[in-house]
Each structure stands twice: as C-alpha cells, then as structure tokens.
Amino acid sequence: MPLLRIATRKSLLAMWQSEYVAARLRMLCPDLDVVLVPMSTRGDEILDRSLAAIGGKGLFLKELELAMLRGDADCAVHSLKDVPMDLEPPFMLAAVLSRDDPADALISNVYLSLESLPIGARVATSSLRRQAQLRFYRPDLRLFDLRGNVNTRLAKLDNGDYDAIVLACAGLRRLGLEQRMTARLAPPEWLPAPGQGAIAVESLTEDARIGTLLAGLDDLPTRKCVIAERTMNRALHGSCHVPVGAYASYEVGGMRLQGLVGCVADGRLVRAELCSAKDEGDMLGRAVAQCLLDAGAAELLAATA
C-alpha cells in the first residue's frame, strides 16, 4: 500500500485541517495509506511577541518544510493565509481546497456587535489588518495583541481579560465553535486576509508522484480567487507587517477583487475594487494593487517599512 505522510502543526485547528485533507485523499485513493506527522513550529512556541516582531507567518512553515527536505514528510497542510506570498524553491502550492467562510468573527460574552461595544472597550487580535479596520470603524477602542491557539484566545476572553476578540470564522467552524460567533465581520465592509478560509497543501516541486496525488484536491475557482488576492498583496509587498485585506469572488460577468491597505495608528483605510471579465486573477491582482497605490496606499506602506 503506497504511503503519504502529511506534516502538520500540533494545534487542534491544524490537526483538524490535516485530518480533513487526509480523509479527502483516502476518498480519492482508497488504497493510499495516509498518516499525519505532527510537529511544533517556532510560530507556535513564541507567544509573548507579535508575529511581525519574530519574523512573520513563515515561522509556521519552516519546520514542516524541513521535514519534507529531510524525507520525513511528503507534504504539509497550512491555512493559506499563513503561507508567505512567495514560496521559495523547491516548494510549491500543490493544492488549494474549496474555500470555507472567509469572514472574521467578533466574539464577546456581553456585547452583540462591533457597534454596541462601549467606548474604550478592550478588543484583542494579533492581526494588524484587523486592528486597522477596528481603528477605522471604532477609533475609541483599546486594542491588544492576542496570540495562541483558538481555545487559548477564547479562554482569555472568558477570563475577562478583554471585552471582545476577533478570530477567523473558518477556524471556529472547523472546531465546532460556531456558537461562539457574536457577529460576522465580512465583505464588502470588512476584508479578510488574502487566502483566508482556504486550506493549502504544500509539497516539493520535484516530487511528481505526490504532486499528481494532491492535484485531485485542488478547487480551481478557489485557486483563481486566491491567486488574485495574493498577487495583489505581492504587488504591494505585503506581509504580516502590513495591514492588507483582499477578497476575490466570482460574480455575474467575471471576478471581482476588493482590496485595502490600512494604518493601525490612525485608522486610515485606502480601498479599491475592480471587476474583470477575463479569468486572469494575477492581472486583476496587479491592477487593484496599482489602484490602491494611486489612491494613497503608498504613503501607508512607507510608514510600515
């Protein structure tokens, strides 16, 4: 029986996502023996500093990529929003699965919406993109960094450390925690991270056998949408150091891409959106990035450099 080993982080959410990929692979190839290879990453272990301060979201990938290079794993499963815009050789995105809910969720045990939070309420999120949008809509809020797995973050809310926190809807749904969502923060008013809600599988470019197996998981509409989002972010030189949001969707007549660049310090947001009848997400991504730059995003990006 052929064997496929999936490198994964050890968190409950990462394990759920990897088990989901494994189950899909077993359905596609019933004679395939799929096993998980759980491991810790530096991004999971260093929780007292922001991701921007310790090197960015690539810290969630490094150990998993090393496992593939050593021959200890054949592929790795990630939340696509955590995958750097440019994967260095010899790695590639072998599959992007059908997207789950791309929105963020406001979670509070007392208040029912972002608007109903009291003046000066304490809201926690580690994402600069979320902080910038919170600052835009509610400049009075006190914002705090919050890292750790989903249950750790919920526990801090439940302990009274904060009045509300912001998490990704997809992660909550995958863990069966939909009931904790107080309000969805969703497009067009609120934009997610590029690729948010999608699961990605990374493999070695040179491994054609694994690449062929994983290609059966790929959802082409999702891949095209996230290509547009990630191309926009790449054109802006975006990273976890920069508050960038993007969301692409198929509508009658073609693909629509909405993008924003924000500033946490003063809550400024620069927005742009375009529709394209051509099925070329990379061109649309570059076009929206240029619109953002023309509208003043260059100044905000320079402030974060």
UniProtKB/Swiss-Prot annotation:
GO terms for cellular component: cytoplasm. One of its GO terms (molecular function) is hydroxymethylbilane synthase activity. It catalyses: 4 porphobilinogen + H2O = hydroxymethylbilane + 4 NH4(+). InterPro entries: HemC (IPR000860), Porphobilin_deaminase_cofac_BS (IPR022419), Porphobilin_deaminase_N (IPR022417), Porphobilinogen_deaminase_C (IPR022418), Porphobilinogen_deaminase_C_sf (IPR036803). This is Porphobilinogen deaminase. It comes from the Bacteria. Its cofactor is dipyrromethane. Keywords: Porphyrin biosynthesis, Transferase. It comes from Xylella fastidiosa (strain Temecula1 / ATCC 700964). Belongs to the HMBS family.
